[in-house]
C-alpha cells in the first residue's frame, strides 16, 4: 500500500527516493508524483527546492540518458526523439548530444559489426536491410552511407 502524498514532506521524500534510484527529468518526476496522488500545487515548489539544492538536474539526466542509450547501441536521432517524447527542450537535448563524448561513428560501427558480422552489403537488398537497421537505431543517413561504402568515419 503506497503512502498518500498530501504534504510537502511526503512529496519530497518520494521524489528523493525516485532520484536515489536514477536521474529523472522534471517532467518525468512530476508525472510519477502525480501518479502517486500528489497535486501540482504541492509538487512544483518541492521540485524547485530540489533543483536549487542540486538534487534534481536536467543536465545530469540528459547526460545519463545519452550515455545509457548510446551504450545500448542507439544513435543520436533516436536518442533525441526519445528525449523529446519525455518532455525535454530540444535545445537542451541538442547541446547535451554535442557535449557528449560519444564517438557516434565508432558506436555505429560496433552496432553494425554485432548485427552483420562486418559483412558489407553485396547487393541492393542487403544494403537496404543494413541501412534500415542502422536508421531505425537512429544513426544519420550520411554516416550509414559512408560505413556501408567502406569510407572513413573519423570525422563523426
UniProtKB/Swiss-Prot annotation:
TM region(s), chain numbering: none
Compartment list: Cytoplasm
Cystine bridges: none
Gene3D superfamilies (alphabetical): Winged helix-like DNA-binding domain superfamily/Winged helix DNA-binding domain
GO biological processes: regulation of DNA repair
GO cellular component, one term: cytoplasm
InterPro entries: RecX_HTH_1st (IPR053926), RecX_HTH_2nd (IPR053924), RecX_HTH_3rd (IPR053925), Regulatory_RecX (IPR003783), WH-like_DNA-bd_sf (IPR036388)
Keyword Cytoplasm assigned: yes
Family annotation (Pfam families): RecX_HTH1 (PF21982), RecX_HTH2 (PF02631), RecX_HTH3 (PF21981)
Keywords: Cytoplasm
Family of this protein: Belongs to the RecX family.
PANTHER family: REGULATORY PROTEIN RECX FAMILY PROTEIN
HAMAP family: RecX
Free-text function comment from the UniProt entry: Modulates RecA activity.
Protein name: Regulatory protein RecX
Lineage: Bacteria, Pseudomonadati, Pseudomonadota, Gammaproteobacteria, Pseudomonadales
Amino acid at each position: 500500500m503506497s503512502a498518500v502524498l498530501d504534504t510537502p514532506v511526503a512529496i519530497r521524500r518520494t521524489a528523493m527516493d525516485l532520484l536515489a534510484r536514477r536521474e529523472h527529468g522534471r517532467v518525468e518526476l512530476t508525472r510519477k508524483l502525480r501518479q502517486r496522488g500528489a497535486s501540482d500545487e504541492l509538487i512544483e515548489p518541492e521540485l524547485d527546492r530540489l533543483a536549487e539544492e542540486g538534487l534534481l538536474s536536467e543536465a545530469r539526466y540528459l547526460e545519463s540518458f545519452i550515455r545509457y542509450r548510446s551504450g545500448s547501441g542507439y544513435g543520436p536521432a533516436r536518442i533525441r526523439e526519445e528525449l523529446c517524447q519525455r518532455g525535454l527542450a530540444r535545445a537542451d537535448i541538442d547541446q547535451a548530444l554535442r557535449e557528449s563524448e560519444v564517438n557516434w561513428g565508432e558506436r555505429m560501427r560496433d552496432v553494425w559489426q554485432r548485427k552483420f558480422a562486418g559483412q558489407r552489403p553485396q547487393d541492393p537488398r542487403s544494403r537496404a536491410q543494413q541501412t534500415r537497421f542502422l536508421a531505425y537505431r537512429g544513426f544519420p543517413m550520411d554516416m550509414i552511407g559512408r560505413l556501408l561504402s567502406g569510407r572513413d568515419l573519423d570525422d563523426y
